[in-house]
């Protein structure tokens, strides 16, 4: 029985261990289309450099086998350099670590308030880029 519990504990540990590779790095990203849902109504196109500033605030992250009902923060459609795209939904938990989901799997980690700030900063940079292109 003790061996079964040890194997079971090891499985839980491995299945919820740190997961970073689920989120592509900035080097893999061509562009990110972001729609903010939390307290704002913003849609914009972010760059790989913007993603480089956002991603660290979502990590380290672990699989959450029993996610709660959280308020939506933002949706990001990530267009990768290999032509594939993926959707990342970011959530705003009432307390504790941040949260996001990819492909129906939920993850806890990072800090959703800092993620939101990084997204809003990216929006400001996108507005500045758009203004500079007009001039």
PLM regions: where:
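Function-determining sites in protein domains
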Residues: 20-135
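Sec-dependent signal peptide recognition
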Residues: 2-10
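N-terminal signal peptide c-region/cleavage motif recognized by signal peptidases
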Residues: 15-17
């Amino acid at each position: 029985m003790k061996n079964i519990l040890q194997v079971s504990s090891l499985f839980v540990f491995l299945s919820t261990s740190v997961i970073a590779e689920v989120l592509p790095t900035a080097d893999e990203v061509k562009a990110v289309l972001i729609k903010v849902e939390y307290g704002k109504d913003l849609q914009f196109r972010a760059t790989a450099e913007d993603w480089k500033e956002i991603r660290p605030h979502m990590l380290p992250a672990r699989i959450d086998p029993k996610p709660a009902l959280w308020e939506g923060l933002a949706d990001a459609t990530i267009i990768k350099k290999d032509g594939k795209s993926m959707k990342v939904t970011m959530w705003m938990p009432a307390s504790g670590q941040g949260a996001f989901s990819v492909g129906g799997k939920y993850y806890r980690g990072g800090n959703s308030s800092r993620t939101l700030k990084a997204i809003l900063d990216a929006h400001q940079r996108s507005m500045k880029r758009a203004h500079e292109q007009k001039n």
